[in-house]
């Protein structure tokens, strides 16, 4: 996770949790005047549009006071969705048995992209099976990770 996302997570997590939601993670996509701050939230009973609106108001208020982003951006608050982003070790633990797509910050075995089944996750390492071969990936080296939805 980049420094800005880490700072934003620390800043926003208490406010999101105060509303009864889990802050799954944050993405800041820089795109000139059209930068986007994505805030992913979850709840054991699911997420509604009203939940997203409530969290958006809370997050906006915090960001207005703290002003951590110097450029213009649009704020998006949503549930993680079927292709759930994976930000923390906890998310990989919850994804054991599922297929995930990950991109590493630093290449391993001359590759950065892995798509496979999560076998285990412990002590900061994710074990992923890709085409019958196992890889041990450090969570700290994962730049981006998502669950790959399967339709049976």
From Swiss-Prot:
Q: Does the keyword Cytoplasm apply?
A: yes
Which ranges of the sequence are coiled-coil?
Answer: none
* Localization: Cytoplasm
Q: Which GO terms fall under biological process for this protein?
A: ribosomal small subunit assembly; translation
An annotated GO cellular component of this protein is: cytosol
Q: Which Pfam families match?
A: DUF150_C, RimP_N
InterPro entries with a match to the protein in the record: Ribosome_maturation_RimP, RimP_C, RimP_C_sf, RimP_N, RimP_N_sf
**Keywords from the named record:** Cytoplasm, Ribosome biogenesis
Q: Which family does it belong to?
A: Belongs to the RimP family.
Question: PANTHER family annotated for this entry?
Answer: RIBOSOME MATURATION FACTOR RIMP (PTHR33867:SF1)
The record's function comment reads: Required for maturation of 30S ribosomal subunits.
Q: Supply the name of the protein.
A: Ribosome maturation factor RimP
